Amino acid sequence: MAVYVVTGKLGAGKTLVAVSRIQRTLAKGGIVATNLNLKLHHFPQVGRYAKQCRVMRIADKPTLEDLEAIGRGNLSYDESKNGLIVLDECGTWFNSRNWSDKSRQPVIDWFLHARKLGWDVIFIIQDISLMDKQAREALAEHVVYCRRLDKLNIPIIGGLISVLSGGRLPLPKVHFGIVKYGDNPQSLTVDKWIYTGTDLYAAYDTKQIFTSDRELSPPFCPVSPYYTHGIFAVKRDAKYYMRMTKIYFKKMNRVWLMASFLALGAGVGFFYKSRQINEQLSNMPVASAQANTTKTDHTIDELPRLSINSFAQMGYDVNVSFKDAKGKIYYSFDLMKSGYALDIKDSCHITLRKRNYIQQVTCEG
C-alpha cells in the first residue's frame, strides 16, 4: 500500500498529478473515492463510452462515517489492484489545530488500516508542516514536492533575456513531482514524475471551493460517462464522415466549381498549345536541315592544301608541322584536338582524316 502526501505552492499542479493517478486507476478498472468534482467524460483514457466507471464522491471534509461507507477498495491480496482515495485541501481539516477534536482520532485510525481495506491514499496539502505531527509520522510514507518549469528562471541566460526584451524567458509549462521516501526534504528520492497534463485540465473543477457544510457536498456516486454523454454522442463511423463530407462540400461547392472550371480551362489550353508545337516541329523541312548540316560540317572539316614543313620523332612521340600555300603553319597536336586523325607512313607521306574528309600530305605539297 502506498500513501502519498502531495505538496506544493498554489498553482504548482498538486491536484493535476492526483487526477492523473485517478485516471490511471480508472483505466485499469480500479475504484476511486475522492472529494474532487470530476468530469469523467473528459478523461482521455476513460472516455465518454465507459460503462463501468466506479467513482465515489465523498464529502469535502470526510468523517469516519464517510470513510466506512466506501467499503473495501480491493477484495484480493494483489495490492496492484487497490482502490485509490484522493483527498484535496487537507490543510483545512487535517491540521494540528483541528486534531484536538475527538472525532479526528478515529479518522487517523481508519487511515492506518486503509491498507488492509485495499486502498491507496493521496493527501493533497500545500505544505507537509500543515499536517498534524502524529498523522504526518504515521501516514506520510511518500512526500511529493511539485514544481512548475515555467515559474523557474535560468541563471545568467534568463537575466540577459530579461534585460534585452523586458520580459522573462518563456519556458514550457511542465510539472515536476519529486517523490521522497519519508517526510524529510533530505530523504531518499525514489521517483520523479514529469508531466504536462494539458489533456486533464477539463477533467476536474479547478475552481472548486471546499466547505464543511455537508448539505452542499453530500456523498454520492456519479453515473458512468456512457449514460450521461456516450449514449447521446454521434458515432464517428463511415456514415458520419460521409455525411460531414457532404455538408462541407455543399458549403464549398461554389468555390470548388470555380476552381474546377479554371483547372479544366488551363488543362485544355496547355493540351492544344502542345499539339500546335508538335505539328510545327513535324512540318519542318528535315532534308534541307540535313543538307545544311552536312554542308556546314564539310566546310568546317576541309583544310587548304598542305605540305609537310617539319617532322620530328622521339620514341613513340611524333611532332609534325604543316604549311599551306600562304605560309600558315598547322601543328599536328592542334589538328588532333580538332578531331583529325594522322596516318603516318613515313616522314614525307601523311594522311589526314576527319569524317568523310581525306587529304594526302607530302613533303613537296
UniProtKB/Swiss-Prot annotation:
Instruction: Please describe what this protein does.
Output: Isoform G1P plays an essential role in phage assembly. It is required to increase the number of adhesion zones between the inner and outer membranes of the host cell. The extrusion of neo-synthesized phages occurs at these adhesion sites. May be involved with G4P in creating zone through which the phage assembled and extruded. Isoform G11P is also involved in phage assembly, probably playing a structural role in the formation of the phage assembly site.
Keyword Transmembrane helix assigned: yes
Identification of the protein by name: Gene 1 protein
| Chain residues that bind ATP | 8-15
Cite the entry's keywords alphabetically: ATP-binding, Host membrane, Membrane, Nucleotide-binding, Transmembrane, Transmembrane helix, Viral extrusion, Viral release from host cell
GO terms for biological process?
A: viral extrusion
- List the Pfam families hit by this protein, alphabetically: Zot
* Sequence intervals crossing the membrane: 255-272
Any one GO MF term held by the record is: ATP binding
**Record's subcellular location:** Host membrane
- Indicate the family of this protein: Belongs to the inovirus G1P protein family.
Q: How does it sit in the membrane?
A: Single-pass membrane protein
GO CC annotations, alphabetized: host cell membrane; membrane
